[in-house]
């Protein structure tokens, strides 16, 4: 029989596990172990994250508390400075008023409309035309104008809004009075021209020098047909007259003034005020279309009246010799105030967007109009006038016969359709009926008969011109400096002379780009002791060094080849506004205006720089500051500067700060910290330096530096015991100017 099968009985017998099943079990166990480890790691990571978040929250809370404390301390210090500035302003005004009262010299109070009107009236009625007396009166008038300008500069319009228009109108009235006094002196000299005629030429050639002006007068008494050109030798100013004027009863007056009474009348003299858009939603019930049109038209009419009144005030002041212009201006101002108060609600409802659009349209100037935000008039103003010579005294049989003419100084219009040239223009035209010159077919008959006038101005010896100056003439109707009508300009750089031709007589000035020395190449601010520091600026062309001590400052001369044009400024201590004005008048403008970024290519920074400057001023007695090349690589919300400690005493050498002392700091509106960066690195890295911490401002970032805590704290601590070492208010208030 065959053998039985093992499973034939039907009972199951144990079998060995398959290899695949064993692997599955091992994998399952491994997955379970990995899952357990993963959960443990996640739990550990969660706990660590919670711990970090808790620490971060605690750190942030600590930083917030620290920041609040630091901001509070800084605000106290800066607030004290601002209060001191306001007190200084008030004391200055009271001191000036008291000095005027104590002098008792008969000088009128420029802030009193009544006294100014009385002064103007008496000047018209009793003022002597003698040139020496006129020059003395000019000093008084200019001092009154200067006092009013200082008031307008020291105080913002918001501080005495009701007086601004009155002060400006007073300035215009005084300027018109001054020009009228010059005309009276000129007329008197012309009436006596034959007594002072030159023995060789037979013409009047007279120059009168004043403290602020020079009157150059030439009268055509001889009427030499060969006359062509005359030069005032000492002043190096000459004019070339066309032949059509050689036989005329005319005189030429060139009045050169060191002051400029025209530019402030331009619409581009001051920067445009930024209009703040009203974020309030439009009312639910907007005005009807008819009402909206009425409001818009009404606003336009008011704006038109305001603009027209400024021009008309200047015209009326020149046409009338009677006082009272200031009162009329005040009446107009009161009338406008009443109208504005009555329409206040309508004005609020008028959209601000429309006003901004109107401002943008005003900024679009004609090509020949000089933008005073971009260019600056330098060297004063040249008034070149063609005058009519009054009848001269005649001597008959020992008697001197003088024709009495009670008329003001009269000007001769040139070019004119019918010029008074000794022969009628019709005769000249009849010689060439077609009005055509074969040699110059492009010229008109008027240009052939009355060619342009040639003028040569010597550049002022106290003004630096870094490029060829631009000539501009004053347009009295538009109240702008313009370049139209100026031709054939030729600049003699070696002899510092500018030659040009003009079709009309008038008022001229020399212009230069205000931003020639911008942007700066570098700058440094180094202390020389308590309340004393030196600012060195390497500009695009010039290099200047300004020393500041207490509330005064001065321009230091360079060691080698100091410019002769600035010799009158070197070493003279002045108040900050006066030094800024003096340097600008001398052609060295290193003081950016609030809108200079429109004309200079720079990286704009969205940082409150004024607040940074204030803190730098507080620290400037013990810290040196400098520019950093990384400032351009940083973002718009960061300012990168170099700072070095200077625990020095008085009169320390300039090179007391070594390269190793400088550290680089990042400053923003809400944070300041030291960077792990040097000026010699190849790439910019915004990384906090080892051991440094974040601070709310520059002031506290310097306070943490060892071993300077005590010295830095004394720079700005208000404690009386630190009075000798802290920076004074008179020094820290300088940035406010």
From Swiss-Prot:
An annotated GO cellular component: axoneme
Positions with biased composition (Basic and acidic residues): 18-61, 276-316, 333-349
Pfam families reported in the protein's UniProt record: Casc1_C, Casc1_N
Region spans: Disordered: 1-61, 274-362, 410-452
Biased composition (Polar residues): 1-15, 417-429, 441-451
UniProt cross-references to InterPro entries, sorted A to Z: CASC1_C (IPR022110), IC97/Casc1_N (IPR031826), IC97/Dnai7-like (IPR023247)
N-terminal signal peptide: none
GO terms for MF: beta-tubulin binding; microtubule binding
Family: Belongs to the DNAI7 family.
Name of the molecule in the record: Dynein axonemal intermediate chain 7 homolog
């Amino acid at each position: 029989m065959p053998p039985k099968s093992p499973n034939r009985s039907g009972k199951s017998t144990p079998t060995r596990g398959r290899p695949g099943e064993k692997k599955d079990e091992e994998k399952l166990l491994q997955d379970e172990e990995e899952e357990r480890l993963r959960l443990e790691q996640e739990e550990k990571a969660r706990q660590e994250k919670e711990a970090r978040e808790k620490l971060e929250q605690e750190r942030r809370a600590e930083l917030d508390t620290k920041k609040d404390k630091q901001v509070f301390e800084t605000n106290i210090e800066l607030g004290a400075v601002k209060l001191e500035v306001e007190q200084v302003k008030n004391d200055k005004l009271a001191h000036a008023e008291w000095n005027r009262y104590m002098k008792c010299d008969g000088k009128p109070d420029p802030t009193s409309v009544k006294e100014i009107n009385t002064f103007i009236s008496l000047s018209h009625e009793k003022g002597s035309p003698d040139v020496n007396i006129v020059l003395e009166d000019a000093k008084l008038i200019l001092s009154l104008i200067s006092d009013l300008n200082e008031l307008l500069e020291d105080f913002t319009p918001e501080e005495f809004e009701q007086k601004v228009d009155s002060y400006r109108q007073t300035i215009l009235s005084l300027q018109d009075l001054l020009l009228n006094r010059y005309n009276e002196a000129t007329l008197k000299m012309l009436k006596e021209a034959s007594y002072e005629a030159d023995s060789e030429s037979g013409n009047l050639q007279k120059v009168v020098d004043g403290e602020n002006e020079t009157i150059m007068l030439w009268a055509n008494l001889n009427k030499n047909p060969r006359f062509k050109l005359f030069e005032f030798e000492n002043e190096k100013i000459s004019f070339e007259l066309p032949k059509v004027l050689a036989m005329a009863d005319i005189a030429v007056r060139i009045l050169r003034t060191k002051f400029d009474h025209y530019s402030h009348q331009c619409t581009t003299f001051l920067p445009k005020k930024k209009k703040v858009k009203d974020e309030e939603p439009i009312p639910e019930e907007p005005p009807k279309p008819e009402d909206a049109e009425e409001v818009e038209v009404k606003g336009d009419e008011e704006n038109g009246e305001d603009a027209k009144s400024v021009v008309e005030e200047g015209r009326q002041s020149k046409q009338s010799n009677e006082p009272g212009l200031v009162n009329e201006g005040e009446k107009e101002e009161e009338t406008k105030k009443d109208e504005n108060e009555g329409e206040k609600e309508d004005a609020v409802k008028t959209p601000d967007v429309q006003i901004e659009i109107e401002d943008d349209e005003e900024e679009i100037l004609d090509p020949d109009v000089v933008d005073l935000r971009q260019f600056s008039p330098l060297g004063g103003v040249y008034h070149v006038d063609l005058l009519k010579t009054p009848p001269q005294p005649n001597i008959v049989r020992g008697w001197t016969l003088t024709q009495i003419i009670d008329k003001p100084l009269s000007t001769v219009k040139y070019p004119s359709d019918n010029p008074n040239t000794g022969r009628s223009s019709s005769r000249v035209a009849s010689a060439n009926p077609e009005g055509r010159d074969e040699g110059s077919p492009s010229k008109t008959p008027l240009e052939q008969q009355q060619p342009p006038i040639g003028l040569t101005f010597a550049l002022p010896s106290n003004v630096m011109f870094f490029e060829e100056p631009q000539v501009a003439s004053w347009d009295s109707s538009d109240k702008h400096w313009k370049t139209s009508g100026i031709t054939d300009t030729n600049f003699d750089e070696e002899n510092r002379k500018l030659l040009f031709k003009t079709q009309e007589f008038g008022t001229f000035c020399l212009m230069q780009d205000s931003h020639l020395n911008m942007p700066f190449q570098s700058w440094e601010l180094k202390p020389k002791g308590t309340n004393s520091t030196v600012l060195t600026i390497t500009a695009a062309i010039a290099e200047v060094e300004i020393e500041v001590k207490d509330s005064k400052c001065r321009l230091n001369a360079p060691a080698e080849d100091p410019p002769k044009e600035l010799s009158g400024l070197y070493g003279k201590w002045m108040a900050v506004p006066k030094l800024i004005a003096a340097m600008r008048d001398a052609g060295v403008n290193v003081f950016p205006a609030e809108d200079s970024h429109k004309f200079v290519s720079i990286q704009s920074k969205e940082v409150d720089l004024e607040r940074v400057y204030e803190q730098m001023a507080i620290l400037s007695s013990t810290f040196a500051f400098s520019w950093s090349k990384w400032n351009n690589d940083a973002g718009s919300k960061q300012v990168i500067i170099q700072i070095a400690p200077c625990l020095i005493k008085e009169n320390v050498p300039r090179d007391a700060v070594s390269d190793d002392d400088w550290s680089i700091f990042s400053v923003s509106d809400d944070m300041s910290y030291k960077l792990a960066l040097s000026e010699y690195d190849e790439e910019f890295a915004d990384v906090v330096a080892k051991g440094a911490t974040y601070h709310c401002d520059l002031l506290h970032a310097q306070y943490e530096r060892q071993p300077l805590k005590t010295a830095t704290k004394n720079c700005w601590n208000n404690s009386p015991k630190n009075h000798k070492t802290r920076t004074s208010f008179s020094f820290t208030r300088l940035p406010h100017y």
